[in-house]
Amino acid sequence: MYKLRKVDKMNRRNFLVGAAGAALSTTMTDRTLGMGIEFHKVGAFELRKYSLKNMAQAEMLHNYLKDAFIPVAKKLGCGPIGVFEQVNHTEIQVVHVLIPHRSVATAFELNQKLSQSKEHLEKGEAFWKATPANAPYDRYESSLMSPFHGMDHLETPDVKSQRIFELRTYESHNDRAGFKKVDMFNIGEIDLFRKAGLNPVFFGQTIIGSHLPNLTYMLTYPDMAAHDAAWKKFIADPEWKKLS
């Protein structure tokens, strides 16, 4: 028996913090936007969600990402890569990895190239030789996204100080409704976000993944007080009320 899902609404919202030393490191910069924000041209985004059972898995996964995956993926043209831990948990249960690609084609090629990289296999040896009883994660999900025309790049904030990242997913009941929501962002909603202090990191329309059709985006703030103030300002904006 299947249960009907309510759609055309914000279905998921997660608050994340950047994992130490790995949150959107700002190499491969194309342009500086000012105020510590950097601009990175992107052809496609991959978003991975690793589910973990314990801190031992978290440590093994982070060591692999830091020592093997991120350095080699950068050499293959990906980046800047972001690693985020979900907050409001006593233990790390979910780790999100954001991987910007030059194109959809390079996204499909990444895993094969990693499997052929001697450096990747050697530096990630403990990860790859882990037994089923000592697996580095339970499972992971992956989605591939196309950047919006209204923001076809990644914006990385200054991550020297701690920040909150908000990952939001909006599901639609059919593709036409999904494209209409993307258009709403492109023609004005992104600009209204910026005006209110909702600082965007990326916007992506999911082309491969679960719960389609959907779009996903990430915002960032110095802290939760700034988050609350920005959303309050956005919701009260007369221009948003006209657009919606």
Residue ranges of model-derived segments:
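Intrinsically disordered, low-complexity polar regions and short flexible loop motifs
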Residues: V72, I235, W240-K242
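Glycine-rich beta-strand-turn "strand-cap" elements at beta-sheet edges
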Residues: L16-V42, G77-E91, L121-Q162, G197-H211, ...
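Extracytoplasmic/secreted proteins, especially bacterial periplasmic and envelope-associated proteins
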Residues: M60, Y64, A68, T106-E109, ...
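Short, well-ordered beta-strand segments in beta-rich or mixed alpha/beta enzyme
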Residues: A44-L52, V83-S117, F165-S172, Q205, ...
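Mature N-terminal segment immediately following signal peptide/propeptide cleavage
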Residues: V42-L61, K66-L76
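N-terminal secretory signal peptides and thylakoid transit peptides that target proteins
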Residues: Y2-A23
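Surface-exposed interaction/gating patches
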Residues: P147-A225
